[in-house]
C-alpha cells in the first residue's frame, strides 16, 4: 500500500520516516527544500542568528567576568552571521535527505493537487504526472498573513522569511505584531544595534502567555531599547516616505523606518491542493481532523500547520508520526494536552499547560509556586539572574496544570516540566526529587516545592 505525503516539513518528513519504518511504500512530494519552513525559513535560521546575538551579549559583558578586551575590539559581521546560519541549515537539510534515502522514501520535487480521493496530479521538474495512492497525508504547512493595505513586497514590507536574509542590519525597523515571531526578531535586531518599534493590538506582548511573564519580558525588552506600543494598530503605510502610520486610542502617530516587518500570524497553505476534488472539508482556519489525524475522508490525513491550531514544529513532528502510525494500522490517538511553547528571546520564555488566568477560570483558587533565578547559584554564575519559574497546581490533588518560565535557558528546562505534567505528577512528589547542584533545574524543583510551602531557598 502506498502512502502519498504532500509536504516535506516537520509533519511530512516525520510521517514519511515513521511510515517507512512500519513497512509502508512512501511517496513524498515537496516543491522546495526538505525540512519546510521550520528548517529553511523559520525555527533553525532564526535561532542561529539569535545565538550569534547571544554571543555578542556575552562578549559585551566580558569585563564583569574578569576578561578585558581592547577598546573597539568588538564588531559584528552580518555576512558571516548569515553564512553560519546557512551552514547550519544546509547540514540539517542534508540530514533529512539522508533519512529519505536511508528509509527508501521516494521524493518528488514539485506540487501536488487532488484529482479525486486517491489520484494526485504532480507537477514537477519532469513535467506532469498522475499518481495513485491508497492513502494521502496533507502536510502542506502555512504561510505568513498579509495586511490587505500593506502586502509583502520583499523590499520594504517584509515577512519573516525576508527579514532573515536582509543584506545588512537595518538601522531602524517597525515590527507589526508582538507575538512570538515579532518578539524574537525585535530582540535579535535590537541587540545588533537597530532601533526597533513594536506595534501590537493587544494590551501586552505575547498575549497568549501568562501576564506576569509577559510583563517581565516587556520590561526587559524596553530596557534593551525597544519601543513598545501595545493597544495600538497599524492603519496605513507611506512607502514613498518609508513611514508606518499607526493609532493608539484616538491619536495617530508616524514612525519612519528602513523596513516594516509584518508578523501578525500564519495561515494554513491550502491554495492549489484542490481539496474539493477529494471531498475534504476545509476552511481558512485549516483542515479539521479527528484524534487519529484523519479528515472527513478516512483514508486522507492532515497534520502540522495545515490543520491550524498549534503551529509548532514539535507538535507537527508528533502529529505526523501519529498519522503515519494510524495509517499503518496502529490504533493510536493524538495527545496535545501538554505541548511546550518556547520563545527564544533574551531572556528566554518557555511555557506548558495553562496560564494562571486559565487555571483560575477552571479550578478557582489554584496553588501558585514561584522561584526566582536571582536565588539560583547557576544563574548568578552565568550572570543571567533575571526571571522566574511559575507553577500552577489544581487545589484538590495538587496536580501540576501549568508551568511558565522566563529566564536563562528555560527552553531546555521545559522538557522536565513536560515530563512532570505528562506523568500527572503532583506538587508534593517534588519532595522526592533531587536536582543536581548547581544547575538551573533547581529553580523548577524549588518552584514545585513552593506550591506546597516547602521551598528551601525562597
From Swiss-Prot:
It is an enzyme of class 1 (oxidoreductase). Binds 1 FAD per subunit. One of its GO terms (molecular function) is dihydrolipoyl dehydrogenase (NADH) activity. The keyword Cytoplasm applies. Pathway: Ketone degradation; acetoin degradation. Its EC number is 1.8.1.4. Coiled coil: none annotated. Signal peptide: none annotated. NAD(+) binds at residues 177-181, 200, 263-266. One of its GO terms (biological process) is pyruvate metabolic process. It comes from the Bacteria. It holds the Pfam family Pyr_redox_dim. PROSITE patterns: PYRIDINE_REDOX_1 (PS00076). GO terms for cellular component: cytoplasm. The keyword Translocase does not apply. The active site is at 437 (proton acceptor). FAD binds at residues 30-38, 47, 112, 305, 313. It is found in: Cytoplasm. Keywords: Acetoin catabolism, Cytoplasm, Disulfide bond, FAD, Flavoprotein, NAD, Oxidoreductase, Redox-active center. The active site is a redox-active disulfide bond. Belongs to the class-I pyridine nucleotide-disulfide oxidoreductase family. This is Dihydrolipoyl dehydrogenase. It comes from Bacillus subtilis (strain 168).
Amino acid at each position: 500500500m502506498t502512502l502519498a505525503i504532500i509536504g516535506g516539513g516537520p509533519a511530512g518528513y516525520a510521517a514519511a520516516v515513521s511510515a517507512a519504518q512500519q513497512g509502508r511504500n512512501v511517496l513524498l512530494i515537496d516543491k522546495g527544500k526538505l525540512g519546510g519552513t521550520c528548517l529553511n525559513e523559520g525555527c533553525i535560521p532564526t535561532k542561529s542568528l539569535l545565538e550569534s546575538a547571544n554571543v555578542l551579549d556575552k562578549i559585551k559583558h566580558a569585563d564583569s567576568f574578569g576578561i578585558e578586551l581592547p577598546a573597539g575590539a568588538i564588531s559584528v559581521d552580518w555576512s558571516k552571521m548569515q553564512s553560519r546560519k546557512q551552514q547550519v541549515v544546509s547540514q540539517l537539510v542534508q540530514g533529512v535527505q539522508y533519512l529519505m534515502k536511508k528509509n527508501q522514501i521516494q521524493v518528488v520535487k514539485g506540487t501536488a493537487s487532488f484529482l479525486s480521493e486517491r489520484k494526485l496530479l504532480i507537477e514537477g521538474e519532469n513535467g506532469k504526472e498522475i499518481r495513485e495512492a491508497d492513502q494521502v497525508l496533507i502536510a502542506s504547512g502555512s504561510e505568513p498573513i498579509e495586511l490587505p493595505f500593506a502586502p509583502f513586497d520583499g523590499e520594504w514590507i517584509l515577512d519573516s522569511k525576508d527579514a532573515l536574509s536582509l543584506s545588512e542590519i537595518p538601522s531602524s525597523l517597525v515590527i507589526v505584531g508582538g507575538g512570538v515571531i515579532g518578539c524574537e526578531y525585535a530582540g535579535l535586531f535590537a541587540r545588533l544595534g537597530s532601533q526597533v518599534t513594536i506595534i501590537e493590538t493587544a494590551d501586552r506582548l505575547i498575549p497568549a502567555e501568562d501576564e506576569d511573564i509577559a510583563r517581565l519580558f516587556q520590561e526587559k525588552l524596553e530596557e534593551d531599547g525597544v519601543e513598545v506600543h501595545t493597544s495600538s494598530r497599524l492603519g496605513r503605510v507611506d512607502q514613498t516616505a518609508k513611514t508606518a502610520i499607526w493609532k493608539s486610542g484616538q491619536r495617530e502617530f508616524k514612525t519612519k523606518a528602513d523596513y516594516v516587518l509584518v508578523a501578525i500570524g500564519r495561515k494554513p497553505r491550502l491554495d492549489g491542493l484542490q481539496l474539493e476534488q477529494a471531498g475534504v472539508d476545509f476552511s481558512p482556519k485549516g483542515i479539521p481532523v479527528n484524534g487519529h489525524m484523519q479528515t472527513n475522508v478516512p483514508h486522507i490525513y492532515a497534520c502540522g500547520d495545515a490543520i491550524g491550531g498549534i503551529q509548532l514544529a514539535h507538535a507537527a513532528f508528533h502529529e505526523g508520526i501519529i498519522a503515519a502510525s494510524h495509517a499503518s494500522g496502529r490504533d493510536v490517538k493524538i495527545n496535545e494536552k501538554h505541548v511546550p511553547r518556547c520563545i527564544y528571546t533574551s531572556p528566554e520564555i518557555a511555557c506548558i499547560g495553562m496560564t494562571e488566568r486559565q487555571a483560575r477560570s477552571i479550578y478557582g483558587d489554584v496553588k501558585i509556586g514561584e522561584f526566582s533565578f536571582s536565588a539560583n547559584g547557576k544563574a548568578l554564575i552565568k550572570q543571567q539572574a533575571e526571571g522566574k519559574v511559575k507553577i500552577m497546581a489544581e487545589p484538590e490533588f495538587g496536580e501540576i496544570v501549568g508551568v511558565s518560565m522566563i529566564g536563562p535557558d528555560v527552553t531546555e528546562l521545559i522538557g522536565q516540566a513536560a515530563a512532570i505534567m505528562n506523568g500527572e505528577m503532583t506538587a508534593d512528589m517534588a519532595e522526592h526529587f533531587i536536582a543536581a547542584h548547581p544547575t538551573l533545574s533547581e529553580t523548577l524543583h524549588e518552584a514545585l516545592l513552593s506550591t506546597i510551602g516547602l521551598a528551601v531557598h525562597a
